[in-house]
Amino acid sequence: MYYNKQAIKATVGHGSVTVKDFSAGINGNKDEENLSLGECAFSYNFNMQGGTLKDGNGVKKSNFGNSPVFSEAGVKPERLYFYKRYNKDAKAYDEYLLIYASDKEIYAAKSTEEQFKKVDGLYFYTPPYACSYNYMGDDVMIFSSDEKMKVYDGTTVTTVENVPSVTSMCIHSERLFATEGGTKTSLWFSDDFNPLNWKVSLDEAGFIDIREGVGSLLKAVSFKDYVYVFANYGIVRVSAYGDQTEFSVDGIAASSGKICADSIAVCGDRVIYLAEDGFYSFSGSSPQRIMRKIDGKIAGVDNSDAKGCYFNGNYYCKLKMQSDCGVRDVLIKYDIHRGTFAVSSELDINDFVVADGEKACELLFLINGKAQPAMLSDRAENFSVPLDKHWLSGKTDLGTTETKRVTRLSLRTLTEIYVTVKSERGSRLLHFFGSNERQSRAVGLKGDLFTVSIDCRTPGATVSALKIEYEY
């Protein structure tokens, strides 16, 4: 008996996945294997808000006055301050930038000047806190640290004697309120209408001892008719109007994680801050968690030196985050109305301040190694030098648990980019050029789980419609 022999062909399945929308952004709370393809394990210097990968924020030369230069040889700028005072003779405001530098001196530049110059007498061993106050009809800048308090009026410096060791301060109801660095449990307040008088008496200055089980006091802020005192592990509300005999501590909100002092910023109708376990928004009652998707990226990272501020509807915070290549210094931009955030990196920020001038309001930065303050740019750049932009997917099985072979990857990009496809069996680097047309590249990589990373250095990034084709 004879049989016809026929070749037995293996059945090959085909499939594809597409990322049409990148706006899901970073999700550090899920294991990478559980991320959807539209989410990413990490990203920086890309703006994903509209669903397309575009340039995020960078910094550029500021337009503050004559863009003054700090040129003191061998001295590094460390802190940045803004000060404005009404010039009665000119009937206009004089505006200044001030820098605390590594030589412990403070340097000032008026907006009409081109160089920072040392201010004689403004010397502090540690970076001071500062706030503006209209004292006896004159706009002055009060500087204070854990060693001394000094007042600068744009020309002269006055040292204030017999003041507490200040670790933060704010103006409330015409008094200066300050947390104290000695016992770290005292909230001091100056005489009303006189922030230079700290003599303790029933009708002058005084202090409130706060021992509520919240740890050391970190920062005092004036918010919604109260002074809120942020401590290591909680927030204390102080009613402080009228006669000091009527001052009272009348509310406490606990924090499960240690609060980072300089991250605290009043943002309109809320205060936003960073604690060890993540970011919080506080509107006067119970703190609420925000930006939960990055909790996993900051867990276990020391952010005791994080700093935050509020500018133009956004909360900005300089901090450290875990990335796919270790711990990174980043700048978070959080839109308080939309609840969205973006991450910038490779800026090397020393400090920043909101310069609330009469003609313009800008967020200004001290960038390490740069002689001039910077301002925000809508391009991913550092003083005209393009920044690397990076997006990394989670680990995906592309919708099937079987071993598969990625055959092609296609997308749209208006600029040059590099795409890396990885599996447990290897990797492929794909090069795409800027074009108005959809582009496709062969991959030829087997595996069970895959990651895709997109890297771009060219300004004006626009990446969309990522499609991965495979067979199994």
Regions found by a protein language model. Give the residues of each.
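Hydrophobic or amphipathic alpha-helical targeting/insertion segments
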Residues: 132-160
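Short strand-coil-strand connectors
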Residues: 103, 145-146, 154, 181, ...
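Short glycine/proline-enriched coil/turn segments at helix->beta-strand junctions
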Residues: 154, 225, 414-416
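Beta-propeller and closely related beta-pinwheel folds
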Residues: 68-76, 122-125, 157-306
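Beta-sheet repeat architectures centered on beta-propellers
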Residues: 1-117, 124-128, 132-135, 255-259, ...
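Short, basic/low-complexity N-terminal boundary segments at the transition from targeting/disordered tails
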Residues: 147-148, 250, 333
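Conserved structural-core and active-site-/substrate-pathway-adjacent residues in large, well-folded domains
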Residues: 80, 140-141, 176, 235, ...
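Residue-level signature of beta-propeller blades and closely related beta-rich strand-turn architectures
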Residues: 86, 146-147, 182, 233, ...
